[in-house]
Amino acid sequence: MTHASVVDVLTGKYAVGTTQTVKGWIRTRRDSKAGISFLAISDGSCFHPVQAVVPNTLANYENEVLRLTTACSVEVTGVVAASQGSGQAFELQATEVKVVGWVEDPDTYPMAAKRHSIEYLREQGHLRARTNMVGAVTRVRNCLSQAIHRFFHEQGYLWIAAPLITASDTEGAGEMFRVSTLDMENLPRTPAGKVDYDKDFFGKETFLTVSGQLNVETYACALSKVYTFGPTFRAENSNTSRHLAEFWMVEPEVAFADLEDNAALAEAMLKYVFNAVLAERRDDLEFFAQHVDKDAIGRLERFVASDFAQIDYTDAIEVLKNCGKKFEFPVSWGIDLSSEHERYLAEEHFKSPVVVKNYPKDIKAFYMRLNDDGKTVAAMDVLAPGIGEIIGGSQREERLDVLDARLAEMGLNKEDYWWYRDLRRYGTVPHSGFGLGFERLVVYVTGMGNVRDVIPFPRTPRTAEF
């Protein structure tokens, strides 16, 4: 590619007086009475478009330039100049405008240059990336993704490709999508009348993964510091602003690490990626602060400047009981904290991110390490002001006998987890890890409010368009 990106022109990479070519799409066209048109051209490389000043002396000015509308694609060659306007430092004084693609009917173009509702944009999933808002979300999402990989790379972690197809239920909740090539109209049956999965592609019942954690643990128990970052799937019939059927998870696993190490890793990672987005995507964050959530930048700046508080679940319950606030969901020891409880702790009690740890075993997964009291497990949730839970993790149960007892307690067949149990039989080691729902992270950074609006093609109950 030999043409210049918009961001490079706007940030002064090219000297004034040099000739450059920009390729992109028209955001707006403005014509002056002096016979000059001003084209705002975007290529997605940054929030702001570059202005091309087009004189009426160009051969195609009358028959093409004056017909350009929002979303027409163009190649504009011109001389880089200091901008006379206040909106940007540099512009292009156009010497040539080539129209690459026209918009067939500007009057019916679904993404015309006006404010659209969030609901409308979801219906136009194939076109919504053309809007300022979704473009900004996409650049922020990319920045966060790259920062996560960079953080773990710099810390000496290895990225592991966890499988998307699995025979294991990590969470033990049973809310999984089945993967099968069997003919649904003519299912093979066993003598007992059950579906015969021996005849299926994998010779057994298989599912889309709900988490890469168990698989990644196998590598942590050999290579010490690993992580996975990829799509996961939950067949929860939840139509909420916090749930997707397909979403991305960041899941590190660390050998020889306890719950305190885990909490420290979570804090370091979150602060690293928030500092990255503050430094690298300021233009997009300013858009969110102006049009979506006025506290978008301030929230992140306060977060990275805060020391994380820590509190035991049992003590958190006492805080909630005695705070004088009436909650929709009553507080008692043994409940799973709801969003209102989490946000009270982070926003009103601590006024900072907080790690709640040592939860009742009955509300947590089988793989979490049983504490000495026999009632709680070494689990943690990181709660952030403005959203509540942003990370969930634990120290893993490394003792085979205790793991087997927990599997039995939860009605899970230990033979289904034979390979996971092998890790405890051959050089077992304390280890810890956590899961970060990536879309919730993007929601927190942008203030968008709904996970459906921060992933390109959201998958939710009864919705799988595009």
Swiss-Prot record:
Domain of life assignment: Bacteria
CDD domains xrefs: AsxRS_core (cd00776), EcAsnRS_like_N (cd04318)
Q: What are the entry keywords?
A: Aminoacyl-tRNA synthetase, ATP-binding, Cytoplasm, Ligase, Nucleotide-binding, Protein biosynthesis
Q: Which GO terms describe its cellular component?
A: cytoplasm
Entry EC no(s): 6.1.1.22
The answer to whether keyword Zinc applies is: no
SUPFAM superfamilies per the record?
Class II aaRS and biotin synthetases, Nucleic acid-binding proteins
Q: Which Gene Ontology terms describe the biological processes this protein takes part in?
A: asparaginyl-tRNA aminoacylation
The record lists the catalysed reaction(s) as:
tRNA(Asn) + L-asparagine + ATP = L-asparaginyl-tRNA(Asn) + AMP + diphosphate + H(+)
- Location(s) in or outside the cell: Cytoplasm
Task: List the molecular function annotations (GO) for this entry.
Answer: asparagine-tRNA ligase activity; ATP binding; nucleic acid binding
Main localization is: cytoplasm
User: Looking at the keywords, is Cytoplasm present?
Assistant: yes
Task: Fill in the subunit field for this protein.
Answer: Homodimer.
Assigned protein family = Belongs to the class-II aminoacyl-tRNA synthetase family.
PANTHER family referenced in this protein's UniProt entry, alphabetically: ASPARAGINE--TRNA LIGASE, MITOCHONDRIAL-RELATED, ASPARTYL/LYSYL-TRNA SYNTHETASE
NCBIfam families xref list:
asnS (TIGR00457), PRK03932.1 (NF003037)
Concerning HAMAP family, the annotation shows:
Asn_tRNA_synth
Q: What is this protein called?
A: Asparagine--tRNA ligase
Gene name of this polypeptide: asnS
